[in-house]
A protein has these predicted regions:
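Glycine-rich, small/acidic residue-mixed loop/short-helix segments
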Residues: 7-8, 17, 21, 25, ...
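Short, charged, solvent-exposed linker or helix-capping segments at domain edges/interfaces
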Residues: 83-87, 135-136, 171, 226, ...
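A glycine-rich, hydrophobic loop/mini-helix early in the fold
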Residues: 12, 17, 170
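Acidic, low-complexity central loop/insert segments
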Residues: 26-165
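Intrinsically disordered, low-complexity, positively charged segments
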Residues: 1-9
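Anionic-ligand-binding alpha/beta catalytic cores of soluble enzymes and soluble regulatory domains
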Residues: 125-217
Length: 292
């Protein structure tokens, strides 16, 4: 990140020595520090991991800002219009925006994922003392314009509709970055030595994937069982085909959709799979729904 300009926002992985995913994080560059925002509610584990390496950089320090802020997320085509009035006017800002009233925003470039456009996705980090007023103002503006306030369950459905992997469901120590389709944006192949560099580079230039993240459409009208992960099998011969990682009922997509890691022999769109409960699926491309 030393070469990135102030105001830039990047996405990256922290890997284990075998190049499996430990954490994924958004990285924002400010004039005097760097913001790190791990996904999946894993802040404590992430901070502990970073502190293990502090002795290599004695001039660095780590501090948690979580207690000073509360967050909310804007998604959809109109999200930038709702967020822009909150920004400062610094022209140097890019994906990281400073809020005029304190706090900051991450403008996620989710279109990088799988080279598909996932639509605007903006995380706002607002000082706790002004959060309730800011939230009320935003909700009023969104509702008056015909927008919707999404519950946590609805946000999860939206994530799956866009085909966005999330820690710890799709992004965890069981998978390589390339299996999630994110190695091109979250891993450097020309940076100096880092944990996991050798095996992740070897996979890139010498190996081939044995499984990858795919979309899944259920042939059942309703979710019979929501617990994940669960194994997937070929509907033809019962052979092991992969793992279902996330599942949701999406009226916009026309039924039950999910994400999962599927083996090479079964990952072609249209391939029929079943899980251990007898629920049937069909491998599908994503996003399931065109972004608004």
């Amino acid at each position: 990140m030393a070469t990135q300009p102030t105001g830039s926002l990047r996405y990256g992985f922290f890997l284990n020595p075998k190049a499996r995913i430990l954490f994924d994080t958004w990285i924002g560059v400010r004039p005097d520090d760097i913001l790190l925002s791990p996904s999946g509610g894993m802040e404590d584990e992430f901070v502990a991991h970073l502190k293990k390496y502090l002795f290599f950089r004695t001039k660095a320090s780590i501090a948690s800002l979580t207690g000073a802020f509360r967050s909310l997320t804007l998604v959809g085509r109109e999200a930038p219009a709702y967020a822009t009035p909150l920004f400062s006017s610094d022209p140097a800002e890019d994906g990281l925006r400073i809020l005029a009233g304190g706090g900051f925003a991450f403008l996620h470039p989710h279109q990088f994922a799988f080279e598909r456009e996932a639509g605007p996705w903006i995380d706002l980090w607002i000082p706790r003392e002004t959060f309730e007023k800011t939230l009320q103002d935003l909700e009023r503006r969104v509702l008056s314009a015909g927008g919707t306030i999404l519950s946590p369950e609805a946000m999860e459905t939206y994530r799956l509709e866009c085909g966005i992997p999330l820690s710890p469901f799709e992004l965890n120590e069981g998978h390589f970055p390339a299996e999630a389709g994110l190695d091109a944006v979250a891993v450097s192949y020309n940076k100096g030595c880092y944990v996991g560099q050798e095996p992740v580079t070897r996979l890139k230039f010498q190996g081939q994937l044995s499984r990858k993240l795919t979309g899944l459409r259920s042939k059942s009208p309703k979710i019979q069982e929501t617990a994940c992960p669960r194994p997937l099998y070929s509907a033809l011969d019962g052979s092991e085909a992969g793992t279902l990682t996330s599942l949701a009922d999406s009226p916009a997509a026309g039924g039950v959709i999910g994400l999962g890691y599927v083996k090479r022999a079964h990952w072609e769109p249209g391939t029929a799979l079943i899980d251990g409960t007898g629920q049937s699926y069909e491998v599908s491309d994503f996003p399931f729904v065109s972004p608004d």
